[in-house]
UniProtKB/Swiss-Prot annotation:
One of its GO terms (molecular function) is toxin activity. It comes from the Eukaryota. Belongs to the conotoxin T superfamily. The keyword Disulfide bond applies. GO terms for cellular component: extracellular region. Transmembrane segments: none annotated. It comes from Conus aulicus (Princely cone). This is Conotoxin au5b.
Length: 11
């Protein structure tokens, strides 16, 4: 899961 919102956060 990746959320390109204010910095990238992929897990």
């Amino acid at each position: 899961f990746c959320c390109p919102v204010i910095r990238y956060c992929c897990w």
